[in-house]
Amino acid sequence: MENGFLLINKEQGKTSFETLFPIKKYFNTNHVGHAGTLDKFASGILIALVGKYTKLAGYFISLDKEYVAEFRFGLETDTLDSNGRIVNKADYIPSVEDIDLKLKDFVGEIYQSPPRFSSIHIDGIRAYKLALNGKFFEIKKRRVNVYDIQRLSYDFSSSSLSLKITCSKGTYIRSIARDLAYSLNSCAYVSNLKRTKIGMFRLKDSTLCKNLSKSSLISLESLSSFKKVYIDSSKVNLVKNGAYVEVQININEFKILKSREGEILAVIEGIGFNKYKYVIIF
């Protein structure tokens, strides 16, 4: 079975799950997952994990993200995107000066309520399923970090604002659109969304599913953030059997264990000072 990860350019109109179908077919395995859902209406980079690399989903999900988004003022949909039903209208369209002033309030550590149409679990049920059934529910605000927001353009005549947003995991761009508009006494939805970066991985280096090849599969050794630890031959079997060997590691740090001959043996994650757990054993 193949093991590795892929940088996929997800197209609009497909769910992240649907995007995996051609990958499963190409590599002839159902052992394929993704790290970080990208909404159906959105496009951009999606990290797909193949084989044992599915166990690294948590690492990839934790990486910071970059988006290019387009907000349209004056209308709000129930989904806060272009696929939703219009539920609110506003005559007031903010000026670019007012927008620039308010954008500053959305940089840094902020609290936001995820959209009602989202994958958040509410008592074990996805929020979007409750919303589709007209159920009343509340979603608690969550703390996220927005590192930078750049205004790329603003067309007052079409009420369209284009932004580049760099943020932490769990940040909802649709919530930023909603909350920014409310702070300006207007309303808005996200008319277009493209994820351009996940951690060090950029959209320009991704591939469309129709262009998949064996060379598209990336190994851990390409990740500079994963330091390598070489294991003496006398301890290789210990690692292969999941036994503890002495390794210097910090909490939340990932390391690759390799044999002196260059064979990748395992991936470990620090859970304390010089304490770790096995994430993958090859």
From Swiss-Prot:
Gene3D superfamilies: Pseudouridine synthase. Disulfide bonds: none annotated. One of its GO terms (biological process) is mRNA pseudouridine synthesis. The keyword tRNA processing applies. It is an enzyme of class 5 (isomerase). The active site is at D39. Responsible for synthesis of pseudouridine from uracil-55 in the psi GC loop of transfer RNAs. This is tRNA pseudouridine synthase B. It comes from Borrelia garinii subsp. bavariensis (strain ATCC BAA-2496 / DSM 23469 / PBi) (Borreliella bavariensis).
